[in-house]
Amino acid sequence: MVLLSPLSIFSLSSLLNLPKQDIDQAVEDLHAILNIPEDQNHSLRLHHPSFRDFLLNKERCGDSNFLVDEKQAHQTLAFDCIKLMSTFLKQDICGQKAPGTLVTDVGIRVENYLPPEVRYACIYWVQHLQKGGIQLQDNDQVYQFLQVHLLHWLEALSWIGKISEGIIAISSLESYILVSQSSFREFLLITTKG
């Protein structure tokens, strides 16, 4: 309910690190509210976007069994994105071996190297952190991810044409750091200011 862009059942399974059968079972009886394509490589979509608002609003959704805690859902997705990227991202992810290769030269192979759930994670993980109200600190999971995978993440963003979003995301992270004098803050300043 809080995805920032639609994903397929396969991609959700990978992003959430859940068996595909669990996702299938969870959406099985939701045809009235979800467009569930026969081709499970196509994205799930809500028939009525207002239903999302209903599930996220405590006053409108009278049944706590259906109520979705939006902040908690964003926190979970943020860390699911980080876990997926930590597992998947690496140097020279598209196997080009030569710096300066154009995206047009790699073409459709970028989709093979960066499947939809990885592209989703790369683009939206910081927004999920922000919407989840997560405060950052030295040596937390976010700091450790960036220390190891910052360049891998930026490389992936460049392959999918989203590098400017990455630079903006890095700059915005600074306001979520708890302590004003921290190595995490210094790391982000060095990253953005050079």
PLM regions with names:
Residues 1-194:
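Leucine/isoleucine-rich amphipathic helices and adjacent mixed helix/strand linkers
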